[in-house]
Amino acid sequence: KELNSNHDGADETSEKEQQEAIEHIDEVQNEIDRLNETA
């Protein structure tokens, strides 16, 4: 219900947030790969 009340600018923010999340996931995956190499 809270998401629907914010639906006016949802498209604009969701796209930016999605890209930021993808970039963050890439960083985390890179860190995991590094940890796996040292393990």
UniProtKB/Swiss-Prot annotation:
Gene3D superfamilies cross-referenced by the UniProt entry: 1.20.5.1500
Keywords: Cytoplasm
Disulphide connectivity of cysteines: none
Compartment list: Cytoplasm
Keyword Ion transport: no
Entry annotated with the keyword Transcription regulation: no
Record-level GO cellular component terms: cytoplasm
Region (Disordered): 1-39
Highest taxon in the source lineage: Eukaryota
Family as reported in the entry's similarity comment: To human SET/PHAPII protein.
Subunit structure of this chain's protein: Oligomer.
Function noted in UniProt: Has a role in the physiological regulation of fucosylation processes.
UniProt-recorded name of the protein: Fuctinin-3
